[in-house]
Amino acid sequence: MKHSKDPFEAAIEEEQEESPPESPVGGGGGGDGSEDGRIEIDQTQDEDERPVDVRRPMKKAKTSVVVTEAKNKDKDEDDEEEEENMDVELTKYPTSSDPAKMAKMQTILSQFTEDQMSRYESFRRSALQRPQMKKLLIGVTGSQKIGMPMIIVACGIAKMFVGELVETARVVMAERKESGPIRPCHIRESYRRLKLEGKVPKRSVPRLFR
């Protein structure tokens, strides 16, 4: 004798027979979920394989270079500002306006030849580079604290010495009846004469090698 099924139980059994079992997410079977899972895994692997360690040092190096250039630029600007301030301070001092000195200067200039006047004008326009003089003073004194007044004085003294060296070399060339540019032999003779006249400072420290 057959028992009749409950209508509710019969409906549940029919639904279970019609719907297939759900596949696990990210499983091996072919479906939308499995393809999305493989795509995510591949993207993760690609991101892990990127040469991150290679790019980061380059960015760091670029940053260090930019910082170094900025520091050097600030240092140059500070040096230029210091030079400008020193020039402004020097202009505050009154210039020599003694009539006797001015008349003497005019008398000397009137006796210059055309070649001498050209050299004198070049001498007045010329100037030694202050950064190079600063490096020289640092090497001589061994101190990094070199003030701008000291650099200006050293440049002025060196400029006067070079001018006397050139003029004495021209006198040597005139005595030898030679023309053209100044040669090393003329500079050596000029230096020897200036040394005999006491215009070359003596060494305070003896030479180690002769």
Swiss-Prot record:
Expressed in roots, leaves and inflorescences. Keywords: Activator, Nucleus, Transcription, Transcription regulation. Its main location: nucleus. One of its GO terms (molecular function) is protein heterodimerization activity. It is found in: Nucleus. It holds the Pfam family TAFII28. Residues 11-20, 76-87 have a biased composition (Acidic residues). CDD domains: HFD_TAF11 (cd08048). InterPro entries: Histone-fold (IPR009072), TAF11-like (IPR045127), TAFII28_dom (IPR006809). Gene3D superfamilies: Histone, subunit A. One of its GO terms (biological process) is RNA polymerase II preinitiation complex assembly. GO terms for cellular component: transcription factor TFIID complex. Residues 112-201 form the Histone-fold domain. Residues 1-98 are annotated as: Disordered. Belongs to the TAF11 family. Component of the TFIID complex. TFIID is composed of TATA binding protein (TBP) and a number of TBP-associated factors (TAFs) whose MWs range from 14-217 kDa. Interacts with TAF12, TAF12B and TAF13. TAFs are components of the transcription factor IID (TFIID) complex that is essential for mediating regulation of RNA polymerase transcription. This is Transcription initiation factor TFIID subunit 11. The gene is TAF11.
